[in-house]
């Protein structure tokens, strides 16, 4: 990695970025991506505007066909540069999802990703100043934030499909988030995934595939 960095400062920035993303990110197995895309196609979802808020190296967008407008966010600097090189036709932002502009509220047809999870705090000024208690509290856990922020970016009837920690569905402390989602979307499907799904990444985590349709 050092030999591809322009200087020592850039090299250190890459290393630090990788360390941070290692705490919350698990890259998506290709068969799962294929199954997700197939199920969305069967459901009749053909997005014109697609968003992956935690794109990694682009496993999700690699299977998109005939989608005119694809937006990706990737917080890790090195992974983001790889993503930009692999998919130059996509609009790649090398920054956290919280940096998305208000212009993109109610904008996308579909938001789909293997989102980061964990009790990592996110800073979003609009959420932090919100009078909605659930929006404000979602900042304390990155996966909860991704659900609410992702829903904001969808237009009415848009589809959100996330791979996420099973804690979203199971944890008592996430009940307010679940209730918020019920009040803002219809549940299309929720599937408990095998614990060994991410074994190639060196970990076993309990995760779910959750598909929602925005309905406010």
Model-derived segments and their meaning:
Residues 89-97:
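Conserved SAM-binding strand-loop segment of SAM-dependent methyltransferases
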Residues 204-216:
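Core SAM-dependent methyltransferase catalytic element
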Residues 47, 107-108, 187, 207:
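Local beta-strand N-terminus motif with an aromatic residue
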Residues 102-112:
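A short acidic, Gly/Pro-enriched loop at the edge of an enzyme's catalytic core
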